[in-house]
């Protein structure tokens, strides 16, 4: 099982576009893509009871439809309920419902900042709208800064593809790469070469 987590600095940062790029560039993994959101989209007809909806139609209308259009094997929208007496989403309950539905060889891409605290991904990519060589970054989601501590690399839109090998400098950590992409939907050769060895084989059970 390979797991990629893609988070972002804010809404509209390009998380979905990057996930579509990953799905298209790595089709042999037959990805199951899961968007985790705190917004109740109210989908009807879900094959799961509760907060998980499976998208079945590829298209451009929703993020999950875009996953399928990019080549994902399956796509889900997960809307976790808040934990009792708190406003924090109960990601543990959603994941506990999700995992048993799949074989051990299923490969997952998650779109979420918070899920990185609940899974052990092969790769965690954080998308930032403006590439910065060092912290502090501009004010962004608190969940972004928490997830950034787990990032293996930063991805940022740019006018051209460029790798900054030591571009992400976090206190107490070794410098990590920043991949600047001219189009988030199209992985640069450098990003593809960097990510493949971290995922392992794409065999399915």
Which stretches of residues belong to each language-model region?
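Active-site rim loops that border cofactor/substrate pockets in soluble metabolic enzymes
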Residues: 73-104
């Amino acid at each position: 099982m390979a797991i990629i987590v893609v988070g972002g600095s804010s809404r509209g940062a390009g998380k979905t576009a990057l996930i579509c790029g990953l799905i298209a560039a790595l089709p042999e993994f037959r990805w199951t893509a899961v968007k985790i959101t705190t917004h109740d989209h109210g989908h009807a007809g879900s094959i799961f009871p509760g907060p998980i909806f499976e998208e079945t139609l590829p298209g451009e209308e929703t993020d999950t439809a875009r996953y399928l259009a990019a080549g994902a094997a399956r796509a889900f929208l997960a809307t976790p309920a808040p934990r009792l007496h708190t406003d924090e989403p109960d990601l543990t309950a959603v994941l506990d419902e999700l995992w048993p539905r799949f074989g051990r060889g299923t490969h997952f891409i998650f779109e979420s900042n918070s899920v990185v605290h609940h899974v052990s991904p092969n790769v965690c990519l954080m998308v930032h709208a403006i590439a910065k060589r060092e912290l502090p970054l501009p004010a962004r989601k608190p969940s972004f800064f928490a997830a950034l501590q787990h990032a293996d690399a930063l991805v940022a839109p740019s006018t051209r593809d460029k790798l900054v090998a030591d571009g992400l400098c976090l206190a107490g950590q070794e410098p990590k790469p920043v991949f600047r992409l001219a189009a988030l939907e199209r992985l640069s050769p450098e990003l593809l070469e960097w990510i493949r060895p971290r995922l392992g084989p794409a065999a399915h059970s």
